[in-house]
Amino acid sequence: ACCARLCCSVPTSPATTICSSDKFCRCGVCLPSTCPHTVWFLQPTCCCDNRPPPCHIPQPSVPTCFLLNSSQPTPGLESINLTTYTQPSCEPCIPSCC
C-alpha cells in the first residue's frame, strides 16, 4: 500500500491533549488538540483514500479533556487504548493511488 503523507498533525509536546474533533486523516492516528471536547477512542485510518474516514470512532469514554503525562487526574484512562500503529513497508505514492 502507498503511504500518503497527508495525515493529521500530531502534537509532539510532552503533554499531548487527545480530544474529539471533526478533522479527517489520510493515514495514521489523529490526535487533535482542540478542547474542550469529549475524548474518543482512537483508530488508525488507511491511506490512499480520496474520501478519508474520520479520525475516531464514536465511542465517548471520558466527558472532559485531559493531558497525558500531567499531574491532573485522568479518569477513565483504563478504557482507552493508546496503541500506536505503524506501516513498515510502504510503496511510493503515485497520483492514481493517492
UniProtKB/Swiss-Prot annotation:
Recorded GO MF terms: structural molecule activity
In-chain residues carrying the UniProt-annotated modification N-acetylalanine: A1
TM segment ranges: none
Tissue and organ expression note: Wool.
Superkingdom, natural source: Eukaryota
Gene Ontology cellular-component terms listed: cytosol; keratin filament
Family matches, as Pfam families: Keratin_matx (PF04579)
Keyword terms: Acetylation, Keratin
Keyword Acetylation tagged: yes
Subunit relationships: Interacts with wool keratins.
Role this protein plays: In the wool cortex, wool keratin intermediate filaments are embedded in an interfilamentous matrix, consisting of hair keratin-associated proteins (KRTAP), which are essential for the formation of a rigid and resistant wool shaft through their extensive disulfide bond cross-linking with abundant cysteine residues of wool keratins. The matrix proteins include the high-sulfur and high-glycine-tyrosine keratins.
Protein family (similarity comment): Belongs to the KRTAP type 3 family.
PANTHER family per UniProt: KERATIN ASSOCIATED PROTEIN 3-3-RELATED (PTHR23260), KERATIN-ASSOCIATED PROTEIN 3-3 (PTHR23260:SF1)
Protein name in UniProt: Keratin, high sulfur matrix protein, IIIB4
Organism: Ovis aries
Higher taxonomy: Eukaryota, Metazoa, Chordata, Craniata, Vertebrata
